[in-house]
Amino acid sequence: EFHPGTFPPSFGSVAPFLADLDTTDGLGNVYYREDLSPFIIQMAAEYVQRGFPEVSFQPTSVVVVTWESMAPYGGPSGSLVEEGKRNTFQAVLASSNSSSYAIFLYPDDGLQFFTTFSKKDENQVPAVVGFSKGLEGFLWKSNGAYNIFANDRESIENLAKSSNAGHQGVWVFEIGSPATAKGVVPADVNLDVDDDGADYEDEDYDLQTSHLGLEDVATQPFPSHSPRRGYPDPHNVPRTLAPSYEATERPHGIPTERTKSFQLPVERFPQKHPQVIDVDEVEETGVVFSYNTGSQQTCANNRHQCSVHAECRDYATGFCCRCV
């Protein structure tokens, strides 16, 4: 049985912040969808291109997942140590016919806690940022490829301050291609800052900064009461995870005997036609791949849109599928 603190699990995983999180107060939510719109496809391609300048990559599928205002699990006694602290972060999986990349995004002030109580042994354990293929083999099973890039307070706290793709808060990993024969390959582009500590962007590189749509599987707007206020403009959101190694170095600690290539299958979700929402609403969410709004919909006329692992809820602006 897997629980945080025992990474890697026996199943395949992509973990931008693996920890016991709590949504019972109704404020934290998880949103996910596959988006094939040209705008989202282009934005994902540009993030990958920024991290891997030598690669020509044009995704055919992009899956976007947002964890918004997640609270830490406080243990059986409801510990108040992390009371009021919330984490918001994103994972984007971009795939073509020959390769796959994971993009992790961490906004300013997006990570406010770094450890949680474990629901298994009631001890505090640090979150983990990593990847695993899970068990493999037939008669004799063993751990497949797995890589851990952050698993202590210092490296996790640095996720929103550093980068391996040259843009603060953005971390890019190649997770499926011939190049990953010995494991996940992280990007290796230094984060340049000027004398004032601000991000420095290459003059000849124009990263797409338009507000792109992030929605749940039902393609409805994010509930109006949920977004946390106080986040900066979305194009300043990308501040990325700091692995346990220095950002200027390759991860020498990846175990070569246990890391093997794996390709992430991308599951198809129901498609909608997103429209970009008002910028003011985007600025409240603090995410890069922002939310979209469509025509008014209700649970009653969209009975089969939600996953079997989600429940449908109606809001004033439409319905959404909430993970359970």
Curated annotation (Swiss-Prot):
Q: Where in the cell is it found?
A: Secreted, Extracellular space, Extracellular matrix, Basement membrane
Write out the biased-composition intervals (Basic and acidic residues): 247-259
- The main place the protein resides is secreted
Q: Which GO terms describe its molecular function?
A: collagen binding; extracellular matrix binding; laminin binding; laminin-1 binding; proteoglycan binding
Post-translational modification as stated in the protein's UniProt record: N- and O-glycosylated.
Question: Where do the NIDO domain residues begin and end?
Answer: 16-178
GO CC terms, sorted: basement membrane; cell periphery; extracellular matrix; extracellular region
Give the keywords, sorted: Basement membrane, Cell adhesion, Disulfide bond, EGF-like domain, Extracellular matrix, Glycoprotein, Secreted, Sulfation
User: What GO terms in the biological process aspect are recorded for it?
Assistant: cell-matrix adhesion; extracellular matrix organization; glomerular basement membrane development; positive regulation of cell-substrate adhesion
Family annotation (InterPro entries): Epithelial_Barrier/Signaling, NIDO_dom
Which superkingdom? Answer: Eukaryota
Q: Where is the EGF-like domain?
A: 295-324
List the cysteine pairs that form cystine. 299-312, 306-321
> Where do the record's region annotations for Disordered lie?
219-259
Residues annotated as coiled-coil are none
Glycan-bearing residues: 97
In this chain, where does the modification Sulfotyrosine occur? 200, 205
Q: What does this protein do?
A: Sulfated glycoprotein widely distributed in basement membranes and tightly associated with laminin. Also binds to collagen IV and perlecan. It probably has a role in cell-extracellular matrix interactions.
Subunit structure, as described in the record: Interacts with FBLN1. Interacts with LGALS3BP. Interacts with PLXDC1. Interacts with SVEP1.
What is the name of the protein in this document? Nidogen-1
Q: Which organism is it from?
A: Rattus norvegicus (Rat)
